[in-house]
Amino acid sequence: VIWYAEDVHHFAMSMNPDYRYEGGHWGDVAIHVLYQPGDTAAWGGGVAVQRTAKALEWLDGVFGKFAWPQISNVHRIEGGGTEFPMMIHDGSADQGLIVHELGHNYLMGILANNEWREGWLDEGFTSYQTTLFDEANGHFGGAAGDEAFLTGMDLDGTSEPASLQSEYYRDFTSYNISIYSRGEQFFHQLEYLVGGESMHRILRTYYDRWKLKHVDEEAFRDVAEEVSGMDLTGFFAQGLHSTELTDYTIGRKERKKTDSGWSTKVEVVRKSPGRVPVEVWVIGQSDTAAARSVGLAEREWVTVETRSEPKEVLLDPRVRTRDWDMMNNQKKFGFHPLGGRDYDLYLDTYFSTPVHRDEATIGFLPTVWYNDAGGITLGLRSRSDYFGRFEQNQFLVSGGTGWATDEDVLDLDEYVRLRNPVWLRSPGMTQTLDVFNVEGRYGAVLSVERTHRPHLSFGPEREVGLRLRWVVPDDARFLVPGEFEDVGTAELELSAGVRDRQGPWQLGLKGTAGGGLVYNSRGLANATGRNDLDPYFYRATLEGTADRTLSPRWRLGLRGFAGVSAGGDGETAKQRQIYASGADPLERITNPFLRSRGAPLLRPDVYYHMAGGGNLRGYDPTVSMSALVAANLELERTVLDRAQKKLFKRVSLAGFGDAGHAIADEDDPITGRNIEFLADAGAGIRAEHRLGQTSFRHSGRLPVLYQPPRPGSGPAPRRRRVRLPLALQFRSSMVV
């Protein structure tokens, strides 16, 4: 058997004696469809033939007449698609997939592109024309989503240029993103630069001139420059061979009355290396006018004429320049609150945060909780966000009403969080400042963390961090007995960690080390009654986790922990010791449901477990010590899995065991309990849910084995040997 074809540079074949065949044509192009038995409903009855004809009609309109006599659309074994001259292999008969794969026949086959050397000129190009097809049929949003994703990668410093030769990408994931998505964005930006009509003529001229010939970047650029009449050398260099960020802002603005209306001068300021012409819109009282900057200079003046009085100036309102900071692209004339910027204001439902590319959001939420000192506490919280990564700030004002309590402590509290301001942007960095005066405590926490991943889909993810924390208790009526001593603490902590997957195991290791001081203006001994309390302390922890699935329904989790926190000659203040059962008091300080005496999840009849410390889940949360080593084991069996549901997405049964040992034989400084060996084991049931963007779980646990601390001079442990506590969690408290 001999196969013969002219004007092709690739070859493929597919053979299956069980194939079903249907045929048709588009003009003088024969259409052959081969599909697998059992897929008649999806492929047969002319479905795949008609969709292939529709794809040919679309592509002929975009580029020009199909240059070969036939096209074969073959149903392949797995999903996705593959392209060859006069043949496409499709995992389904989806119209968009057929348009994409058949587009390769034009852009890789007829325009003979070397995909190994310049994949963007094939994969990026056909992704672009597929998006045009989707938009022509009323399906929008794909290109905008890709733009936001790619800009995020640029901000994280993980992008690679679209023009690299295939083997030079650091991994297959980066290759796919760069030549498909970044390649597609290049063509969208070219269309923005030259205009839609010129872009259409570029595509048809390029196809007509180079069909059935070998093509490269130079061939396409020459056509684009000839048709548009523009020098595109810089644009091609930036769009294909770099990953430079773009950021323009509005500088000064002036408006004046003219004989025909109003003239507005706008200073366009370039703040990042990326250069692209920027649309400048002036919104008047009854009309809108636009002009375009050159975009090359650091500062450039643009004049816009309107008939009515100008009210507002916008840069790039259509989000076509890939400007990463759109918050500085708007200015209004006159005085306006919030700096003259528009914000998307919404009623916060807690479970979801709207994220926009072109403006920030601010959500408002009334809050209510309870504690024994202030009673029912009412407040108002706002939280903001830009781009899902910047200006993630929170402001909360709350106050106790004295309702439902005999103590009637009226206290106005404030909490402010500033997170990731735009002006501190740095790849992989997260900056957070908390300042608070809440329920008998005031202080501040400043933290900086950097994460780094050499590869996007595999390999280790490393993080390093620095945190400065200052906390002072000032009203003991709010404090949980046995968790605080009457001293302020200030400490500096360094942290480092790594997460990775090795075979079936998801592994993690994190360590912290730091030190600080405890103080009280009345003197430590007078404030605490302890003559042994050293003003200086050191603190270090090391945590390792290992998690794997044993089968589709079984999962095993392991955790090891070691921690030490002590003064120069012995124990440090209670609030900075190592806690046996979970998170320590300072880790819980931002959660009003876990913060103060009598809080909803900190009552004697409710047990909420917030992971941390030794994770000895059967113990009273006030049990602490200077040094502890602990191990946790968990075996989980899924009994119900409904991934598409919102409530009870997954229900599982779990058995757990925890063991810990105090490194030094010591007594708890407040309760007097002697602490040495601790252990617990039990079983529980978990249910996982998802509301909005938030996944959470609740669980009930039954400790069946429990080793209490040895009796001392203080009160007995709160936990009894057998108990069914309620644990409601908005984050996982599993050991890993």
Question: Where are the regions that the model predicts?
Answer:
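Amphipathic alpha-helical substructures
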Residues: 176-264
